[in-house]
Design a protein with these regions (language model features):
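Histidine-dependent nucleotide/RNA phosphoesterase domain, centered on the 2H-phosphoesterase fold
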Residues: 1-179
Length: 179
């Protein structure tokens, strides 16, 4: 049986993707593997490798898990180094803690039998690029990336996605609308 690499995401509106891609141009010379604009998203839950035969059941369970959720807002406020500024791994677009997103994460993970902390606040982020560690460490002067950018978006659905080609291509398997 073939395995698929599956995750649940919140899509980013194209207008926000465009704005983010315009912002990161100033850092293009850094040793960073930048994400393609079309792949920008918020990961709700990484499910992992599963047999393709169980994908329809996963999609159905996630649809059921999110069926009672109302659309909600997420506020973003900065582009910064993360998760630790002293030893960064990524450059990300960071949001403010969001209880509703934490509940959504919990509902998805509980319905799939994954561990989840109860109603944790969830700080959303969008990975913009992954730092190439060896080249980064050789930089004579490390950049201080902390750019304020206030953007709010509405979450009205989640999608079950398949990642192919080492994360170079994402395929939507199911869109699950919120109420």
């Amino acid at each position: 049986m073939q395995k698929k690499k599956i995750f649940v995401e919140i899509g980013i509106p194209s207008s926000i993707k465009k704005r983010l891609m315009q912002k990161i141009v100033q850092w293009k010379e850094l040793p960073v593997k930048w994400m393609k604009g079309e792949n920008l998203h918020i990961t709700v839950s990484f499910i992992g490798y599963v047999d393709e035969s169980v994908v329809p059941e996963i999609c159905q369970k996630i649809n059921e898990a999110v069926a009672d959720f109302e659309a909600f807002e997420i506020a973003f406020d900065s582009i910064e180094l993360g998760p630790n500024v002293d030893d960064p791994k990524i450059i990300w677009f960071c949001g403010k803690s969001n209880k509703e997103l934490g509940k959504l994460n919990e509902a998805v993970e509980q319905t799939l039998g994954m561990r989840s902390q109860k109603h944790k606040e969830y700080r959303p982020h969008v990975t913009l690029g992954r730092i190439r560690k060896l080249k980064w460490e050789k930089l004579s002067e490390k950049p201080n990336i902390n750019e304020k950018i206030n953007i709010t978006m509405t979450v009205d659905s989640v999608s079950v996605m398949e990642s192919k080609g080492g994360g170079a291509e994402y395929i939507s398997l199911e869109e699950c609308p919120l109420v």
